[in-house]
């Protein structure tokens, strides 16, 4: 929004031209989202406590989690508000890249809100029925997948980038829709499964978003894109604003979500942020790289699949409890140790993912 005002004011003072630079607006976007989260966080926590919107803890979970019962949840609203305000202020609202991610955040955030509302307000421990949750996620993801496929006017927009191989970028054709769908829905649910300990999901989300900010910047500049053998995507640089807004809002939320948490993000936060990472990966053609950089999310998801599959096929469990972070808790690891070690793994995987941009 302010881009257009600055563009108009440039005719009176050329210094306003600085707002045309994505990097400058990205920094402002990060700071805006961060300060918003820090400023409104205490107010939101107080409001959630007053409304008695508290976390419901399963009786069959780790005993250490019983003390979390009643902790304010649905704090993801704070993250989404910070991201939206920041992007609307500093982003180029004429960019379809921006609106695609905002649509994903809003639609998956609404699904998560309904799920949380049923759990904490209507006291329905199951929340939104899994079938309906999946249907709604699928509808939102397919809308984006079909839109991106139909609106693609450059070959790079529907190519698949394969890490480590600079000359392997096959055209996906109609399979683009399938890949985009599974990337968005899969990422959404993977982050949701990871969000089980204080700060466990938000920090890897911040790291992956920061990495995608760099990738979006490189993909939006023809010289960098050609040098690194990335698809050149004109206008993709605006995704930098979105990514840094997620980083800022996420760090601001972590201020209150770090152990012991004062607030949880709830499904309204985890489903929307996961879907946003998936959508950004699709937009910059880095679906495989998301699997690498978001390896912690993948690990958590695979642990659940293996646990359920093993129990149904053999009647035996592989882990003491799934997702896998609970397994380590039941082994006696203190919660902060599990969290920080998963953060370290996430940092390593993000750096590995960024290294693949050059290791081709």
From Swiss-Prot:
InterPro entries cross-referenced by the UniProt entry: Glycosyl_transferase_4, PNAcMuramoyl-5peptid_Trfase, PNAcMuramoyl-5peptid_Trfase_CS
Q: What is its main location?
A: membrane
Q: Which UniProt keywords apply?
A: Cell cycle, Cell division, Cell inner membrane, Cell membrane, Cell shape, Cell wall biogenesis/degradation, Magnesium, Membrane, Metal-binding, Peptidoglycan synthesis, Transferase, Transmembrane, Transmembrane helix
What Gene Ontology terms for biological process does this UniProt record contain?
A: cell division; cell wall organization; peptidoglycan biosynthetic process; regulation of cell shape
EC annotation from Swiss-Prot or TrEMBL: 2.7.8.13
Q: Which reaction does it catalyse?
A: UDP-N-acetyl-alpha-D-muramoyl-L-alanyl-gamma-D-glutamyl-meso-2,6-diaminopimeloyl-D-alanyl-D-alanine + di-trans,octa-cis-undecaprenyl phosphate = di-trans,octa-cis-undecaprenyl diphospho-N-acetyl-alpha-D-muramoyl-L-alanyl-D-glutamyl-meso-2,6-diaminopimeloyl-D-alanyl-D-alanine + UMP
Pathway the protein acts in: Cell wall biogenesis; peptidoglycan biosynthesis
A single GO molecular-function term is: phospho-N-acetylmuramoyl-pentapeptide-transferase activity
- Tell me what topology the record assigns in the membrane: Multi-pass membrane protein
Query: Where, by residue number, does the polypeptide cross the bilayer?
Result: 21-41, 74-94, 97-117, 134-154, 168-188, 199-219, 236-256, 263-283, 288-308, 338-358
Q: Name one GO cellular component term.
A: plasma membrane
Entry cofactors: Mg(2+)
Where is the protein found, in the record's own terms?
Cell inner membrane
Which family does the similarity line name? Answer: Belongs to the glycosyltransferase 4 family. MraY subfamily.
Q: Which HAMAP family match?
A: MraY (MF_00038)
Cited function: Catalyzes the initial step of the lipid cycle reactions in the biosynthesis of the cell wall peptidoglycan: transfers peptidoglycan precursor phospho-MurNAc-pentapeptide from UDP-MurNAc-pentapeptide onto the lipid carrier undecaprenyl phosphate, yielding undecaprenyl-pyrophosphoryl-MurNAc-pentapeptide, known as lipid I.
- What is the protein name stated in its UniProt record? Phospho-N-acetylmuramoyl-pentapeptide-transferase
What is the name of the gene encoding this protein? mraY
């Amino acid at each position: 929004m302010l881009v257009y005002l600055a563009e108009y004011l440039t005719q009176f003072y050329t210094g306003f031209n600085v707002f045309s630079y994505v990097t400058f607006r990205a920094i402002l976007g990060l700071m805006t989202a961060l300060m918003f989260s820090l400023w409104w966080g205490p107010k939101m926590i107080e409001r959630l406590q007053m409304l008695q919107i508290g976390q419901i803890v399963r009786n069959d979970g780790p005993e250490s989690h019983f003390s979390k019962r009643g902790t304010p949840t649905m704090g993801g609203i704070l993250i989404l508000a910070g991201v939206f305000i920041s992007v609307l202020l500093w982003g180029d609202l004429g960019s379809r890249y921006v609106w695609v991610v905002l649509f994903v955040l809003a639609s998956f955030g609404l699904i998560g809100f309904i799920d949380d509302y049923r759990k904490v307000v209507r006291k329905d421990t199951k929340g939104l029925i899994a079938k309906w949750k999946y249907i709604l996620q699928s509808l939102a993801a397919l809308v984006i997948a079909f839109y991106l496929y139909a609106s693609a006017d450059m070959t790079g927009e529907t190519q698949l980038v394969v890490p480590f191989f600079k000359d392997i970028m096959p055209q996906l054709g109609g399979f683009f829709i399938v890949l985009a769908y599974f990337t968005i829905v899969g990422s959404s649910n993977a982050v949701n499964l990871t969000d089980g300990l204080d700060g466990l999901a938000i920090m890897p989300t911040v790291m992956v978003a920061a990495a995608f900010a760099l990738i979006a910047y490189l993909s939006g500049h023809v010289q960098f894109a050609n040098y690194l053998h990335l698809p050149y995507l004109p206008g993709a640089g605006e995704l930098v604003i979105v990514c840094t807004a997620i980083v800022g809002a996420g760090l601001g939320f972590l201020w209150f979500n770090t152990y012991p948490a004062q607030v949880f993000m709830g499904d309204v936060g985890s489903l929307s942020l996961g879907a946003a990472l998936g959508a950004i990966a699709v937009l910059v053609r880095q679906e495989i790289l998301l699997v690498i950089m978001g390896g912690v999310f993948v690990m958590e998801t695979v642990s659940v699949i293996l646990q359920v599959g093993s129990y149904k096929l053999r009647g035996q469990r592989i882990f003491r409890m799934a997702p896998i972070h609970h397994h380590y808790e039941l082994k006696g690891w203190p919660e902060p140790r599990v969290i920080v070690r998963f953060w370290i793994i996430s940092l390593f995987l993000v750096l590995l993912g960024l290294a693949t941009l050059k290791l081709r």
